[in-house]
């Protein structure tokens, strides 16, 4: 189990208090592209075309972390 897999497991167990930089690191490890056109949101796009937009404000709400985990593991977006 790699570092990003462990981070996903931690996110699944506790979806609170995550930063956008941590999500970007996991996305890089999983080969998921992201873009941040402004400062308020980041859009993650899975290679299968599924996407998820996450507000970049801290703390990130747990519902977005749950959706992010689902995007990384199953390729299911919004």
What do these predicted ranges mean?
Residues 2-36, 46-78:
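Basic nucleic-acid-binding interfaces
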Residues 41-45:
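Minor-groove-contacting beta-hairpin "wing" of winged helix-turn-helix DNA-binding domains
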